[in-house]
């Protein structure tokens, strides 16, 4: 009943794709666009062919084309040569973005890659500290994104029930919980009422079965 797109590059974001997401309710209003780093210097070191300004314009375009869209991303922390100032620049940039979810990874050496051979590897304790700081920001950004939808009624596809609480996903990939009687695998109109765990708690308004 739901189709979710995987990780995409900017060149894949065509007007036709936006129209498809808007017009076909099977498609989730969710896009995963990997940023990788929020510092232009680190992006250049990673040999990425974009900078933060270009990425910000891309996000602005996506949000204007698909209202309510959720944009998730990947962030790599501790890339060789990353300074504290560059890491802080990354935090500052991410803080300005409206990400629904951030997957934060520490840089891991891959044998045979130029980065693995560099002598300016970030020490593991420093890398670990930066991961924790970026994850804390990620949690804050997720909560900030969820707050935008409290009070709205959205379609939720419920999936699993545990101890009387059923959870599922909106079409823009927000985890929703309810203690109402619902059937797994069915879509319901749910009023989103308050932050709860990693998502929002709500109550069923209409069943779309």
Task: List PLM regions with ranges.
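Extended hydrophobic-aromatic, low-complexity segments
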Residues: 29-31, 43-44, 67-73, 85-87, ...
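Flexible glycine/acidic-rich beta-alpha junction loops that bind and position SAM and/or redox cofactors
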Residues: 12-16, 35-46, 77-84, 100-125, ...
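Short, electropositive alpha-helical surface patch
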Residues: 15-29, 82-99, 124-129, 158
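Conserved, mostly hydrophobic/aromatic
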Residues: 5, 33, 74, 94, ...
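Proteins enriched for Cys/Gly/acidic motifs involved in redox and nucleic-acid/cofactor modification
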Residues: 31, 53-64, 88-96, 105-113, ...
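Conserved SAM/AdoMet-binding glycine-rich loop
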Residues: 1-84
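Terminal RNA-binding accessory module
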Residues: 117-209
